[in-house]
């Protein structure tokens, strides 16, 4: 492997709360995460890093470098629904393949469950993992779930797919699955359902597969890009019996599993050390979105307002840290704004292609064959000059907050957050059911003087303070308008999915139209 092409190891948890990592909370939660902390201590920790407000959105934003408003990938809805990652939207993996990278994805995907949406037809050489969030995959074990005898058509149409192991192939298979569609250029093995029992150890399974993949690439002297998506700590948490109590007295099974989660991160870090490739490997730890706090104590913790699926910082603000020995100064704490979109241009720059954003705007060939034409608008910025100390500021000065229905909830511009729509529900699962309230005039927050967005609730002078700064709402409107201008040339790819019954009915009607076989 040449120094110009570093390995890239991206490790994600699921719904990880900032305060559940001891590098942020300083042990306040009663346990430690020494392996995750090690990445922060040996690299750069971010305080102002943003994902999206839910799982699919955060994952699609990262892997495509595009806004969910652009890709339509804010959620994928029910199993079997024909919504997922489109072939026209290149992934980090597809852009790295022509540069000589081996690409592997392990763990949760959640970007569509049809064959055409699997990672191995979107630039990854190998995939081993699940396709949904955990609570959806344990539903078939519920006592009230319809049996095959009671509702055979419904069960067959809505049953989640199993844990998939797939490999990219050069040959285009002529096999067509009646539910999941054409197989395409991949070989697919269904390793069985992700049961509640298997959930206890599935992260160990996928971590082992990632270890094997990395070893093979190292032996072949090929640079690798690995996206390791651990399923923990998504609701519901199923803790190994032998792990119970390891977080300490008066703790919880959730914290016990956080210790296991940290241990899997350590397995990958230890491997990088054992292979002697630490100096040649970019390592990132992060997550998709803010915590699902309403399931506490089986849920994560954040100091920011509210939680996942809202407009507040608690939904979007995420833990993030990056290590690259010799390039990124260890022990750095960054207060600069970064967002998941930014890693695509950053990784490509690190791999030797700093002009990828401009290339993709005008048309660029990439993909596994190196000959697939892509023309897209990347919403990310190249962070590499900032990470390596060449410049003092992140190129990103703000971001736009979207709901999972594609609504513009607000914007951040430097210190300022301007809120157009707000979730007024204070907590519980109701935050997923109650609609956002559209404000007649936007609210304003200063995320430096009020980082936890408390002022409109607690301050006697909030409204006086805000009325003196109403001019900033026009600033916010101008930023959104500028963003929307890009859609003249690059229109939205598809509409977001829905958690309502509409998509399920559509799929059931399609299924019945084929005879329900």
Predicted stretch roles:
Residues 1-438, 442, 451-517:
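Formylglycine-dependent sulfatase
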């Amino acid at each position: 492997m040449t120094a110009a092409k570093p390995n890239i190891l991206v490790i994600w948890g699921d719904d990880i709360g900032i305060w559940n990592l001891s590098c942020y909370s300083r042990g306040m939660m009663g346990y430690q995460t020494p392996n995750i902390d090690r990445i922060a201590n040996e690299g750069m920790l971010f305080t102002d890093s943003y994902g999206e407000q839910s799982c699919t959105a955060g994952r699609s934003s990262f892997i495509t470098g595009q806004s969910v408003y652009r890709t339509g990938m804010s959620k994928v809805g029910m199993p079997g629904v024909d919504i997922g990652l489109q072939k026209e939207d290149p992934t980090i993996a597809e852009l790295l393949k022509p540069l000589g990278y081996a690409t592997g994805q392990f763990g949760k995907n959640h970007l569509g469950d049809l064959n055409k949406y699997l990672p191995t037809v979107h630039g990854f050489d190998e995939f081993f993992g699940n396709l949904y969030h955990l609570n959806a995959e344990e539903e078939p074990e519920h006592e009230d779930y319809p049996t095959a005898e009671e509702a055979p058509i419904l069960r067959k149409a809505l049953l989640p797919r199993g844990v998939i192991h797939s490999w990219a192939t050069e040959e285009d298979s002529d096999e067509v699955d009646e539910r999941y569609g054409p197989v395409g250029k991949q070989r697919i093995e269904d390793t069985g359902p992700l049961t509640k029992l298997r959930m206890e150890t599935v992260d160990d399974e996928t971590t082992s597969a990632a270890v094997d993949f990395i070893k093979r690439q190292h032996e072949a002297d090929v640079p690798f890009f690995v996206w390791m998506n651990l399923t923990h700590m998504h609701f519901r948490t199923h803790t190994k019996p032998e792990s119970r109590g390891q977080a300490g007295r008066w703790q919880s099974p959730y914290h016990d599993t956080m210790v296991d989660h940290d241990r899997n991160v350590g397995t990958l870090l230890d491997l990088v050390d054992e292979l002697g490739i630490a100096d040649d490997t970019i390592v990132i730890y992060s997550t998709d979105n803010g915590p699902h706090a309403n399931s506490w104590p089986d849920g994560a913790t954040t100091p920011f307002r509210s939680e996942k699926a809202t407009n507040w910082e608690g939904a979007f603000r995420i833990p993030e840290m990056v290590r690259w020995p010799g390039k990124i100064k260890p022990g750095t704490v960054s207060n600069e704004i970064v967002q998941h979109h930014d890693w695509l241009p950053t990784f490509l720059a690190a791999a030797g292609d700093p002009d990828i954003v401009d290339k993709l705007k005008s048309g660029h060939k990439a993909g596994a064959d190196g000959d697939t034409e892509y023309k897209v608008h990347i919403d990310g910025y190249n962070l590499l000059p900032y990470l390596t100390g060449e410049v003092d500021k992140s190129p990103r000065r703000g971001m736009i907050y979207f709901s999972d229905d594609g609504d513009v909830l607000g914007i951040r511009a430097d210190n300022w957050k301007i809120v157009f729509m707000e979730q007024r529900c204070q907590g519980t699962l109701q935050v997923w059911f109650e609609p956002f309230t559209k404000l007649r005039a936007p609210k304003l927050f200063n995320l430096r003087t009020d980082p936890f967005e408390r002022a409109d609730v607690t301050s006697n002078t909030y409204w006086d303070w805000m009325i003196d700064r109403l001019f900033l709402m026009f600033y916010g409107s101008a930023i959104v308008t500028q963003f929307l201008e890009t859609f003249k040339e690059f229109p939205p790819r598809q509409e977001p999915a829905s958690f309502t019954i509409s998509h399920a009915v559509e799929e059931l009607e399609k299924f019945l139209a084929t005879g329900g076989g």
